[in-house]
Swiss-Prot record:
Gene that specifies this protein: rplC
UniProt family annotation: Belongs to the universal ribosomal protein uL3 family.
Modification note: Methylated by PrmB.
Region (Disordered): 133-153
Domain of life: Bacteria
Subunit structure: Part of the 50S ribosomal subunit. Forms a cluster with proteins L14 and L19.
Gene Ontology BP terms: translation
Name under which the protein is recorded: Large ribosomal subunit protein uL3
Record's keyword annotation contains Ribonucleoprotein: yes
Species per Swiss-Prot/TrEMBL record: Pectobacterium atrosepticum (strain SCRI 1043 / ATCC BAA-672) (Erwinia carotovora subsp. atroseptica)
Role according to the record: One of the primary rRNA binding proteins, it binds directly near the 3'-end of the 23S rRNA, where it nucleates assembly of the 50S subunit.
Length: 209
């Protein structure tokens, strides 16, 4: 089953009939418009390309304008592609709503995490700090050794060090679907999802459900 493009509205909480508080993230999923359908004969694989939201006319490039016009849909703020499984069929110009998640229990949500700039190893990788006293006056949050000696004579790739934290693609898996509000195009999932309020998200049925 394909996924949909949505927008993070923010977090709130809802209550069950028993009075239990559930923290939820509200995701607005406006109708996704199909801009292109790819098939085995022409493209070598089956997929559907969708757009969502709106984009100012002066922000749409000529190639984009032609692409949207050919599909007969309004220009959107993003283009995303989802692989199709056997039996799934879509047509160009078709509108797909949040209702496709009505029978889905768990979803995977992908977004771009909040950027936090250049961070040290304690914040970025949860390294332990060194002694606050006992003769230590300069190396409280220092990373410590980053290698061995003449053998191997290098720092191994992937070594956890200070650097850019956040602002990367992150997927949170198997979040419970709490509510699907088709009237207001809202999807409520339990827990937090990556990204800032207003950022784009990709919501798919969970692969580990």
């Amino acid at each position: 089953m394909i996924g949909l493009v949505g927008k993070k509205v923010g977090m709130t909480r809802i209550f069950t009939e028993d009075g239990v508080s559930i923290p939820v993230t509200v995701i607005e999923i406006e109708a996704n418009r199909v801009t292109q359908v790819k098939d085995l004969a022409n493209d070598g694989y089956r997929a559907v390309q969708v757009t969502a939201g709106a984009k100012k006319a002066n922000r749409v490039t000529k190639p984009e304008a032609g692409h949207f016009a050919k599909a007969g849909v309004e220009a959107g703020r993003t283009l995303r592609e989802f692989r199709l499984s056997e039996g799934e069929e879509f047509t160009v110009g078709q509108s797909i709503s949040v209702e496709i998640f009505a029978d889905i229990k768990k979803v995977d949500v992908t977004g771009t995490s909040k950027g936090k700039g250049f961070a040290g190893t304690v914040k970025r990788w949860n390294f332990r700090t060194q002694d606050a006293t006992h003769g230590n006056s300069l190396s409280h949050r220092a990373p410590g050794s980053i290698g061995q000696n003449q053998t191997p004579g290098k720092v191994f790739k992937g070594k956890k060090m200070a650097g850019q934290l956040g602002n990367e693609r992150v997927t949170v898996q198997s979040l419970d679907v709490v509510r699907v509000d088709a009237e207001r195009n809202l999807l409520l999932v339990k827990g937090a999802v990556p990204g800032a309020t207003g950022s784009d998200l990709i919501v798919k049925p969970a692969v580990k459900a």
